[in-house]
Amino acid sequence: MKFGLRYCNTGPYADPLKAVALAQAGEAAGFDSLWTAEHTVMPESYASAYPYSADGKLAGGMTDMPLPDPLIWMAYVAAATSRIKLATGILILPQHNPVLVAKQVATLDHLSGGRVLLGIGVGWLKEEFDILGASFADRGKRTDEYVAIMRELWSADRPSFQGEYFRFDGAYCRPQPVNKRVPIIVGGHTRAAAERAGRLGDGFFPARGAPAELIAIVRQAAAKAGRPADAVEITTSMPEDPADLDRLSNLGVDRVLVPVTGLGGLKTALAGPEDAARWRDTIARHATA
């Protein structure tokens, strides 16, 4: 089992010195990855239901919390580290132009030596889509097409694509990623997200917990798509009780993420960069689990 750090670009880690300190401490302690969050803009009020709380609202202080652009934050700490992977967890893909995202992600992967993991989601905050001028109603369908576009640009010698939203023939987007692909981790808590992960993802990230039923849906969707049952890596949040790590391993979880703040009510959090070292023994103990 692998361990990553979550919410790395939030709150205090918007500060450049603290960002580097966190990234370097995580790498030194044996964490395999740094995971960032994204909201380009947060409306002061909204009717959309936040899916990860009982009352459908974000926790207090999250609306105006500093939240740097995840890809730029990752590029910044990439220059101060050498091994730790750099992940979005998640990037709200249908809010973006997929050709531009493909370029940005490939550039970051190229410059960091192949360390990027692209976690994607369809988003939940309609008001944010409205501010950005992005389509909310068809965001799932757009996500599927955008993934196909990025993979074409990353891997093809002569990229061409004919889709519902984008079409191009012989469009070069260089440099390509180090391995001509970047692992795509599908985030979400719904059946649709789990099926998308099984059908086309390299990973699945149910944001809270590791529901066995969602993991089963991922495996079923992978099999239906003609993919191996273990083709999709499972990442989830660190349980509040470390004794649950064995249970998660038995469910097929490959990676757990330790929050670096108490964002969203999560209680298992680092006290600061200096706190990363205390995880060394836990990481070593579960390295082959």
Q: Which residues fall in each region the model found?
A:
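Active-site-adjacent structural elements that line small-molecule/cofactor binding pockets in enzymes
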Residues: 1-289
